[in-house]
Structures are given as structure tokens and as C-alpha cells.
Amino acid sequence: MNWLEKGPVKVAILDLYEGKANQGMRCIRTILHDWAGSNDLELQVTEYDVRLRNELPDTSYDIYISSGGPGDPLISRFDDWDIAWGRWLDKMTRWNQNPSTTRKKYIFFICHSFQLACRYFNAGLVCKRKSTAFGVFPIHMLEAGKDEPV
């Protein structure tokens, strides 16, 4: 995608931190600001409080970033926010699978969101860790992802 084709790049940040103190949201904002600056892009960024306010974006954005957050994705399956997040992901998936859609929607899932997405797509078994962990864990690309532009 040529980001310069159509004015500002619209970015939706889905905040799953549930109002808890974190470094994730600050880092996401910084990375976006730096990326826009180094590519001479104008950004329109909107943040959505998914867990406390049940806020979710529509399909008008170019990029979606769904954050990490506290808690256990194994036990939130029946929480209102988790159900709404799954419906949002279903809407985004249907958008991208529609053959008449010319501009696909790109979603970056971070930590907690990545686990929710794995659960949604049945892409792996989400299970408890052996111990508390922080940092980067390896992920492996699925065969279908090798042809994706992002």
C-alpha cells in the first residue's frame, strides 16, 4: 500500500489495558509518531477503551493496533468486552475476505490481543505459562501469511 495515495493515515488503537498503568500505550504512540515522521506522513490516531468502555472502531481506518493488557484470555471469553472484541474481529475478517474489497484492513495484535486472535482463529492453543514472563516470544508465520503485503 502506498500510504501517500490518500491523505492522512487513519490509525485505531484498541486499548486493552483496562485502565491499568502500563508502558505499552506510550510505546505504541511513540512508534506511530516516529514512523509518521520518518515517512513524512500525516496520522489521524483514535484510541478506543475496549475493556472499560466497550469501545470499538468501525471499518473506516487504515491500520488497527490492538494492545496487550492484563488478565487471562482463557477466562474472559464470556466478558462483554471480549464478546464485542470478537464480533469486531469477525467484522474485520469478513471485510478482508470480501472479494470486492480493494483496501484490506491491517491489524497488529500485541500480546493479550495476539492470544485473543489465536483463540478466535484457532491458530494455536492458548494456555497458561509455566511462570510469569515479560519480553518477546517467537511466533511462526502460517503458510497463508507468506503472500500478505504487510
Where is each model-derived feature located?
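N-terminal beta1-alpha1 cap of cysteine-dependent amidohydrolase-like domains
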Residues: 1-98
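Structural signal for conserved beta-strand scaffold positions within catalytic alpha/beta enzyme cores
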Residues: 13, 47-49, 109, 127-128, ...
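Short secondary-structure capping/junction motifs at helix and strand boundaries
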Residues: 42, 100-105, 126-127, 148
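Short, flexible active-site-adjacent loop segments at beta-strand->alpha-helix junctions, enriched
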Residues: 70, 113-114, 145
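Short, amphipathic alpha-helical segments
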Residues: 79-83, 111, 130-133
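Catalytic nucleophile loop
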Residues: 96-121
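Pocket-forming structural segment of enzyme catalytic cores
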Residues: 122-150
